[in-house]
């Protein structure tokens, strides 16, 4: 087997084949992915710079947005440059340990994105249900601790992915029909029993997804009750409009995630493998691409921040929570 050493069934490297069955069209497939990646990097880095530069945006909501942007740009950067090397230069080899590292960061950052969306829902809950205590509840230390706790949660849950994958013997070859090192795609290359990998992967996906979605659902239930109790229609519209960008991000992220998750596990045999691979890439690229667009279009404070950033002190705005 290519990549074997004499004393172990662990390969020295894997071969990422890209999109199986569509090798002849790799160049054309790469174009929309490259375009989306550029938008994601420019948009999210722009948001981070804007929030760090504009003192008026130094509020909990925008700190969480900056954390989401950092997570998004890091997530797509872990897989898109390598994918483009496969598509453009036919550089398909990836070192075994590099593959495990990519696997860890892809899954950890995916969980991190879900966790940050959950924190943003809690932020909106505090802002709308406890507006007078908003600044005293969500202080900078609290925000930092919440972000750190979310990060550590995902690190601790995803580390076993690499350990479980590393223990498997690889005697069937080292060719992976994918554009990046996904946990189960790598495990299925092995000639060992990867049932533990499958069970643990399902458990982690459900644990992170169910917990975060429950927190988001409870937060928005309380928000809806608080908004509906307001006497003024204008006040209800103003309060709920602060949540629209976040709700759009939730829909984009979780619809893509659940589509990938359920089609892969329950109707996978009825869907061609190349469709799975393309959807898996879109699942990782679509939220980072769309989030800065959604927040730029839907959030008045971001629009005003961009204008002020470009024009300097010539204009001034009043920012709400």
From Swiss-Prot:
<comment type="function">
    <text>Odorant receptor.</text>
</comment>
<feature type="transmembrane region" description="Helical; Name=7">
    <location>
        <begin position="277"/>
        <end position="297"/>
    </location>
</feature>
<dbReference type="InterPro" id="IPR017452">
    <property type="entry name" value="GPCR_Rhodpsn_7TM"/>
</dbReference>
<dbReference type="InterPro" id="IPR000725">
    <property type="entry name" value="Olfact_rcpt"/>
</dbReference>
<comment type="similarity">
    <text>Belongs to the G-protein coupled receptor 1 family.</text>
</comment>
<feature type="disulfide bond">
    <location>
        <begin position="99"/>
        <end position="191"/>
    </location>
</feature>
<keyword id="KW-0716">Sensory transduction</keyword>
<keyword id="KW-0807">Transducer</keyword>
<feature type="topological domain" description="Cytoplasmic">
    <location>
        <begin position="220"/>
        <end position="239"/>
    </location>
</feature>
<feature type="transmembrane region" description="Helical; Name=4">
    <location>
        <begin position="142"/>
        <end position="162"/>
    </location>
</feature>
<feature type="topological domain" description="Extracellular">
    <location>
        <begin position="261"/>
        <end position="276"/>
    </location>
</feature>
<feature type="transmembrane region" description="Helical; Name=1">
    <location>
        <begin position="28"/>
        <end position="48"/>
    </location>
</feature>
<feature type="topological domain" description="Extracellular">
    <location>
        <begin position="1"/>
        <end position="27"/>
    </location>
</feature>
<feature type="topological domain" description="Extracellular">
    <location>
        <begin position="163"/>
        <end position="198"/>
    </location>
</feature>
<keyword id="KW-1015">Disulfide bond</keyword>
<keyword id="KW-1133">Transmembrane helix</keyword>
<feature type="topological domain" description="Cytoplasmic">
    <location>
        <begin position="49"/>
        <end position="56"/>
    </location>
</feature>
<protein>
    <recommendedName>
        <fullName>Olfactory receptor 52N2</fullName>
    </recommendedName>
</protein>
<dbReference type="GO" id="GO:0004930">
    <property type="term" value="F:G protein-coupled receptor activity"/>
</dbReference>
<feature type="topological domain" description="Cytoplasmic">
    <location>
        <begin position="298"/>
        <end position="321"/>
    </location>
</feature>
<keyword id="KW-1003">Cell membrane</keyword>
<feature type="transmembrane region" description="Helical; Name=2">
    <location>
        <begin position="57"/>
        <end position="77"/>
    </location>
</feature>
<keyword id="KW-0472">Membrane</keyword>
<keyword id="KW-0325">Glycoprotein</keyword>
<feature type="glycosylation site" description="N-linked (GlcNAc...) asparagine">
    <location>
        <position position="5"/>
    </location>
</feature>
<dbReference type="Pfam" id="PF13853">
    <property type="entry name" value="7tm_4"/>
</dbReference>
<keyword id="KW-0812">Transmembrane</keyword>
<keyword id="KW-0552">Olfaction</keyword>
<dbReference type="GO" id="GO:0005886">
    <property type="term" value="C:plasma membrane"/>
</dbReference>
<dbReference type="InterPro" id="IPR050402">
    <property type="entry name" value="OR51/52/56-like"/>
</dbReference>
<feature type="transmembrane region" description="Helical; Name=6">
    <location>
        <begin position="240"/>
        <end position="260"/>
    </location>
</feature>
<keyword id="KW-0675">Receptor</keyword>
<dbReference type="InterPro" id="IPR000276">
    <property type="entry name" value="GPCR_Rhodpsn"/>
</dbReference>
<keyword id="KW-0297">G-protein coupled receptor</keyword>
<feature type="topological domain" description="Cytoplasmic">
    <location>
        <begin position="123"/>
        <end position="141"/>
    </location>
</feature>
<dbReference type="GO" id="GO:0004984">
    <property type="term" value="F:olfactory receptor activity"/>
</dbReference>
<feature type="transmembrane region" description="Helical; Name=5">
    <location>
        <begin position="199"/>
        <end position="219"/>
    </location>
</feature>
<feature type="topological domain" description="Extracellular">
    <location>
        <begin position="78"/>
        <end position="101"/>
    </location>
</feature>
<feature type="transmembrane region" description="Helical; Name=3">
    <location>
        <begin position="102"/>
        <end position="122"/>
    </location>
</feature>
